[in-house]
Amino acid sequence: MSDFRQDFIRFAVEEQVLRFGEFVTKAGRPSPYFFNAGLFNHGASLLSLARFYARSISESGIAFDMLFGPAYKGIVLAGATAMMLAEQGRDVPFAFNRKEAKDHGEGGTLIGAPLKGRVLIIDDVISAGTSVRESVEIIRANGAEPAGVAIALDRMERGQGELSATQEVAQKFGLPVVAIASLDDLLGFLAGSPDLADNLTRVEAYRTQYGVR
């Protein structure tokens, strides 16, 4: 396991963004863990999160010209990651959308830099793929081209069919998807964490029932 991926899982656990217990997923599945990126809700944690995104994106090798963050969680993620990339020597523009169009002031549904060139979509997770689909439509409608999708955690579980939600997005839109960490990284972290080892069996069982390889 890459050190920064393990560091991300540890960071998410420490921030209580990644929790263990009894939860129900958006798909209605009982899950032994829950990841809520909305709990990265103070300056220091957002700074660290942006650093992880920037490294994951840089190591992916995806060619892109700007970032796009779909409302609502993607808004903060795009801005924070753009700041971190700039600090590391790569200054890229970013944009995001509103859920509702504004009919005064600057108007419209888009805020930020004009969508141009190859646009990397940045979000927290991929569930049903709705956010990605809407983002792709917005980007193409503005004459730009989606370059890929960057997310925090790939749960690696089946979506509508035998593919994971991430795999479905990659197949449907022909876009690379890069995650800071995946379920494999989570399992590796649990295996090396004696204080959390009692969760390993339950997460492995969940992977066996709902996961993809």
UniProtKB/Swiss-Prot annotation:
Source superkingdom: Bacteria
A matching Pfam family: Pribosyltran
Record's catalysed reaction(s): orotidine 5'-phosphate + diphosphate = orotate + 5-phospho-alpha-D-ribose 1-diphosphate
Any one Gene Ontology BP term: 'de novo' pyrimidine nucleobase biosynthetic process
Read off the InterPro entries from this record: OPRT (IPR023031), Or_phspho_trans_dom (IPR004467), PRibTrfase_dom (IPR000836), PRTase-like (IPR029057)
- Identify the EC number(s): 2.4.2.10
Q: Which cofactors is this protein said to need?
A: Mg(2+)
Binding-site residues, 5-phospho-alpha-D-ribose 1-diphosphate? 26, 72-73, 98-99, 102, 104, 123-131
What GO MF annotations does this protein's record show?
A: magnesium ion binding; orotate phosphoribosyltransferase activity
This protein's UniProt keywords: Glycosyltransferase, Magnesium, Pyrimidine biosynthesis, Transferase
- One CC-aspect GO term: cytoplasm
**Which residues does orotate bind?**
F34, F35, S127, R155
Pathway(s) this gene product operates in, as recorded in its UniProt entry: Pyrimidine metabolism; UMP biosynthesis via de novo pathway; UMP from orotate: step 1/2
Subunit (UniProt): Homodimer.
Instruction: Give the family, as the similarity comment puts it.
Output: Belongs to the purine/pyrimidine phosphoribosyltransferase family. PyrE subfamily.
Its function, per the record, reads: Catalyzes the transfer of a ribosyl phosphate group from 5-phosphoribose 1-diphosphate to orotate, leading to the formation of orotidine monophosphate (OMP).
Under what name is this protein listed?
Orotate phosphoribosyltransferase
Organism encoding this protein = Laribacter hongkongensis (strain HLHK9)
